Amino acid sequence: MLSPSLPRMNILGFTVNFLIRCKVLPRRSNTSSLSRNISVLASYDQEEVSPGRYSNEFSNRNLVHEILQLCARNGAVMEAKACHGKIIRIDLEGDVTLLNVLINAYSKCGFVELARQVFDGMLERSLVSWNTMIGLYTRNRMESEALDIFLEMRNEGFKFSEFTISSVLSACGVNCDALECKKLHCLSVKTCIDLNLYVGTALLDLYAKCGMIKDAVQVFESMQDKSSVTWSSMVAGYVQNKNYEEALLLYRRAQRMSLEQNQFTLSSVICACSNLAALIEGKQMHAVICKSGFGSNVFVASSAVDMYAKCGSLRESYIIFSEVQEKNLELWNTIISGFAKHARPKEVMILFEKMQQDGMHPNEVTFSSLLSVCGHTGLVEEGRRFFKLMRTTYGLSPNVVHYSCMVDILGRAGLLSEAYELIKSIPFDPTASIWGSLLASCRVYKNLELAEVAAEKLFELEPENAGNHVLLSNIYAANKQWEEIAKSRKLLRDCDVKKVRGKSWIDIKDKVHTFSVGESGHPRIREICSTLDNLVIKFRKFGYKPSVEHELHDVEIGKKEELLMQHSEKLALVFGLMCLPESSPVRIMKNLRICVDCHEFMKAASMATRRFIIVRDVNRFHHFSDGHCSCGDFW
């Protein structure tokens, strides 16, 4: 075994101090065999003796064992090295158990290479030795090394345990290695440990991280024993894969079984509520959080702050933020992002200043929110200032999000040529989000030349995204380029591009209702459509006129109007007007960008019904009130 590079030291002195520091020994200890054992251990440093003289002192080995465990808990690498040297000098290099504890101590201290040296020098290894090394590599995010040593373990004929497989599965989860996951699943089935609590939980967690949610569900449902961690992992898996409704249903199922709730489960459920704009259920979850004692937990608080902001309740979001005593950078970024999404620049700037006064240094996420709010509110010079500030003052390199925001800021201000020049100066290949920002601005200013440049790039980067074709067709329509519209439609058909089906959600009486374009499955759809017909007549008196020029189906105008009335956000709005009290705002979430016609419809609805309407689409929040929208008709 390799000896650690360490000078000879008085192990008695540092061991006593170390044990006192770790609260194993009292500061005044007159008795205890432990003190005697320290003296025995130290005596080896004081005189040259043969190890056999102390062969009866078994407690000496136990003391080294105990000190190493304390080293692991406290990250004390110097003490661990001293014990390593003592192990070599008193000829305990063949003690597998002691060496396993030494490997673990080096591991917990962050000294991976030293741990590997001890492992490689072992004359004999146990299952614990292999498991400790696999766990070490997994904790240090060294996935390849974890898989390699597992393969080495199998090649040497060692039988693995449930702990081995669960650790290797955790390693695969970092890079979402689906192939390795399948192999390990087969291996666990072959060795009859696939239904083990820890293996099953690790398997479903990995499948979910790899986007294989059906496989994760299959593993979950096949497990006879499930812990709170298992349930939490499955709920989180649904949320990671954007199956938010399924996450809420599973959580309710767990509640009926009176399972213990932890902060990770609660955060996942809160996240599901925020992405469904399910404010009522979100409030209920917040109450559960406070009752469970997690209200002051900064991790959970960040989820609650985000939920209220995404549901359009900024007041509640800020109250929760204010109540957290120890705020971290994530929490600051969450509240700043919340106000930015609602286009509240004044509050964003104030929070940014307070954040710095609190000793927090802004990061890339912070500047994404700052640039975003500048784009939503037309603050061109402020946007330029922040873009420069992040580089010169904070040494942050702008990423895709920052460049996309800057293109959006310039484009919204009509500075399309400058936005295009910025894109050409980007030190990496511009992404779809960057070209998409330029194309959206071209629609507003009817700039056909740059629109075609941006669209061509988008067709290359996102050949299956029908939204880009639709947006270009809208620009052609605005410029009365009917022949180009026909070509665009033909290209759309020839490429067999599938448009993402529009969906909208609305939370009514503790239940999330989902509407798709052309909805027919909702139990009250006939009543909704009848009410919609009557409302359209009413809204026309307030200036609403169907924007048939943006409906690209090659049909008669009457049919185009009919198709526009089938949009999911209109159906969700009508259902909300039917079911919610007149004093309640209507909150809707949409999975796509709200179309021009629906935007005009919402404006007319807010004026005709005197209701406050909030629509959260894929890009931003729209607050409709008295015939106006917070976006200023630019989105």
From Swiss-Prot:
One of its GO biological process terms is: RNA modification
Which UniProt keywords are listed?
A: Mitochondrion, Repeat, Transit peptide
Residue numbers spanned by region Type DYW motif: 541-635
* Region Type E(+) motif: start-end pairs: 510-540
Tell me which GO cellular component terms the UniProt record holds: mitochondrion
Does the keyword section mention Mitochondrion?
A: yes
Q: Name one GO molecular function term.
A: zinc ion binding
Note the InterPro entries from the entry.
Answer: DYW_dom, E_motif, Pentatricopeptide_rpt, PPR_At4g14850-like_plant, TPR-like_helical_dom_sf
Q: Where are the PPR repeats?
A: 60-94, 95-125, 126-160, 161-195, 196-226, 227-261, 262-296, 297-327, 328-362, 363-393, 399-429
**Residues annotated as transit peptide in the record:** 1-38
**PANTHER family attached to this UniProt entry:** PENTATRICOPEPTIDE REPEAT-CONTAINING PROTEIN
UniProt record similarity statement? Belongs to the PPR family. PCMP-H subfamily.
By what name is this protein known?
A: Pentatricopeptide repeat-containing protein At5g04780, mitochondrial
Gene symbol of the encoding locus? PCMP-H16
